[in-house]
């Protein structure tokens, strides 16, 4: 890394395990400066509950970034709306969570931070606070005015991107259009090259229907939509294999010769990845004008403040973001 970079972290739902995980992250040295967008008392109280040392240093944007030393975090303060009891949701803190996301996103857009790592949020409490909220991915897409974003989850062994995300199953077929596939594959291909350092990405593409449509006998979306798009993009030089039946695609003879899989919908691709690497996975938002990674698990309210939360996914998300920073320099 040419110079030390700043990475901003949002712990997510304050009553959940996000603050625990951030405190655990602070127990080791990092080659980047970790700027945590959060309430100071929340972090120090959670550190005390866990019996872990934590010193908060003020964020100084005009000073050179410094590698993070063990037992410390750099704090960009955002005040809680209500006091927090670990494991107990408070509706007003839905506003607090969104404020942390907005500040972190804006800092990435204005060049303060090289990447953003997000902890788990509770979508229900944010919506209960009167803020329409579908998820991190959609929030950052809108705030950054990105034309289109793509959700990808990854472990060390497997990357799975989604053509559609949070749609009811009955709406998926209508959503799979030539325009959508062109856009999604272009973003996936571009970010695999620029953020992952893969010169010529090899992408496996799932069919939509069982057996990838069985030659049109089990649905015609492959023939009518997916195959023509893949043929066009192959003619432009992209290395695309598919559409392949999703029930047989996830095996070594295919995956060993691929850099990523494109699934047509959420529950087509993610169960395989989460079964293979739950707790080690990372959620990446492709298509944003900055690097964003996230844990692949929820708020786990019942574990908050107990010292039982596994920091593995957060560590993996941060390490991946650091690698992506290097690739983009």
Swiss-Prot record:
<keyword id="KW-0460">Magnesium</keyword>
<keyword id="KW-0963">Cytoplasm</keyword>
<dbReference type="GO" id="GO:0050570">
    <property type="term" value="F:4-hydroxythreonine-4-phosphate dehydrogenase activity"/>
</dbReference>
<dbReference type="InterPro" id="IPR037510">
    <property type="entry name" value="PdxA"/>
</dbReference>
<keyword id="KW-0560">Oxidoreductase</keyword>
<keyword id="KW-0479">Metal-binding</keyword>
<comment type="similarity">
    <text>Belongs to the PdxA family.</text>
</comment>
<dbReference type="GO" id="GO:0000287">
    <property type="term" value="F:magnesium ion binding"/>
</dbReference>
<comment type="pathway">
    <text>Cofactor biosynthesis; pyridoxine 5'-phosphate biosynthesis; pyridoxine 5'-phosphate from D-erythrose 4-phosphate: step 4/5.</text>
</comment>
<feature type="binding site">
    <location>
        <position position="211"/>
    </location>
    <ligand>
        <name>a divalent metal cation</name>
    </ligand>
</feature>
<feature type="binding site">
    <location>
        <position position="292"/>
    </location>
    <ligand>
        <name>substrate</name>
    </ligand>
</feature>
<feature type="binding site">
    <location>
        <position position="166"/>
    </location>
    <ligand>
        <name>a divalent metal cation</name>
    </ligand>
</feature>
<feature type="binding site">
    <location>
        <position position="136"/>
    </location>
    <ligand>
        <name>substrate</name>
    </ligand>
</feature>
<feature type="binding site">
    <location>
        <position position="283"/>
    </location>
    <ligand>
        <name>substrate</name>
    </ligand>
</feature>
<dbReference type="Pfam" id="PF04166">
    <property type="entry name" value="PdxA"/>
</dbReference>
<dbReference type="GO" id="GO:0050897">
    <property type="term" value="F:cobalt ion binding"/>
</dbReference>
<keyword id="KW-0862">Zinc</keyword>
<protein>
    <recommendedName>
        <fullName>4-hydroxythreonine-4-phosphate dehydrogenase</fullName>
        <ecNumber>1.1.1.262</ecNumber>
    </recommendedName>
</protein>
<dbReference type="InterPro" id="IPR005255">
    <property type="entry name" value="PdxA_fam"/>
</dbReference>
<feature type="binding site">
    <location>
        <position position="137"/>
    </location>
    <ligand>
        <name>substrate</name>
    </ligand>
</feature>
<dbReference type="GO" id="GO:0008270">
    <property type="term" value="F:zinc ion binding"/>
</dbReference>
<feature type="binding site">
    <location>
        <position position="274"/>
    </location>
    <ligand>
        <name>substrate</name>
    </ligand>
</feature>
<keyword id="KW-0521">NADP</keyword>
<keyword id="KW-0520">NAD</keyword>
<keyword id="KW-0664">Pyridoxine biosynthesis</keyword>
<keyword id="KW-0170">Cobalt</keyword>
<feature type="binding site">
    <location>
        <position position="266"/>
    </location>
    <ligand>
        <name>a divalent metal cation</name>
    </ligand>
</feature>
<comment type="subunit">
    <text>Homodimer.</text>
</comment>
<dbReference type="GO" id="GO:0042823">
    <property type="term" value="P:pyridoxal phosphate biosynthetic process"/>
</dbReference>
<dbReference type="GO" id="GO:0051287">
    <property type="term" value="F:NAD binding"/>
</dbReference>
<comment type="function">
    <text>Catalyzes the NAD(P)-dependent oxidation of 4-(phosphooxy)-L-threonine (HTP) into 2-amino-3-oxo-4-(phosphooxy)butyric acid which spontaneously decarboxylates to form 3-amino-2-oxopropyl phosphate (AHAP).</text>
</comment>
<dbReference type="GO" id="GO:0008615">
    <property type="term" value="P:pyridoxine biosynthetic process"/>
</dbReference>
<dbReference type="GO" id="GO:0005737">
    <property type="term" value="C:cytoplasm"/>
</dbReference>
């Amino acid at each position: 890394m040419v110079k030390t970079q700043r990475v901003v972290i949002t712990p997510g739902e304050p009553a959940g395990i996000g603050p625990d995980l951030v405190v655990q992250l602070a127990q080791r040295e990092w080659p980047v400066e970790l700027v945590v967008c959060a309430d100071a008392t929340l972090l120090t109280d959670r550190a005390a509950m866990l019996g872990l040392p934590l010193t908060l240093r003020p964020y100084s944007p005009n000073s050179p970034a410094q590698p993070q030393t063990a037992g410390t975090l750099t704090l960009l303060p955002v005040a809680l709306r209500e006091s927090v009891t670990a494991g107990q949701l408070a509706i007003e803190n839905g506003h607090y969570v969104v404020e942390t996301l907005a500040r972190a996103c804006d800092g990435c857009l204005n060049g303060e931070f090289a990447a953003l790592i997000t902890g788990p949020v509770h979508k229900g409490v944010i919506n209960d606070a009167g803020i329409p909220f579908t998820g991190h991915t959609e929030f950052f897409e809108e705030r950054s005015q990105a034309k289109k974003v793509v959700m990808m989850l990854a472990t060390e062994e497997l990357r799975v991107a989604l053509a559609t995300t949070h749609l009811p199953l009955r709406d998926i077929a209508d959503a799979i259009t030539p325009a959508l596939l062109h856009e999604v594959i272009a973003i996936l291909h571009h970010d695999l090259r620029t953020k992952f350092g893969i010169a010529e990405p090899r992408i496996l593409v799932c069919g939509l229907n069982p057996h990838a449509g069985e030659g049109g006998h089990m649905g015609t979306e492959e023939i009518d939509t997916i195959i023509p798009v893949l043929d066009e993009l192959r003619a432009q030089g992209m290395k695309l294999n598919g559409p392949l039946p999703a029930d047989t695609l996830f095996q070594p003879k295919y995956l060993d010769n691929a850099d990523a899989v494109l699934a047509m919908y959420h529950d087509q691709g993610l169960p395989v990845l989460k079964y293979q690497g739950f707790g080690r996975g990372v959620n990446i938002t492709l298509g944003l004008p900055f690097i964003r990674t996230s844990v692949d698990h929820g708020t786990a309210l019942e574990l908050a403040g107990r010292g039982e939360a596994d920091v593995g996914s957060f560590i993996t998300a941060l390490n991946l973001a650091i690698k992506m920073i290097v690739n983009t320099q």
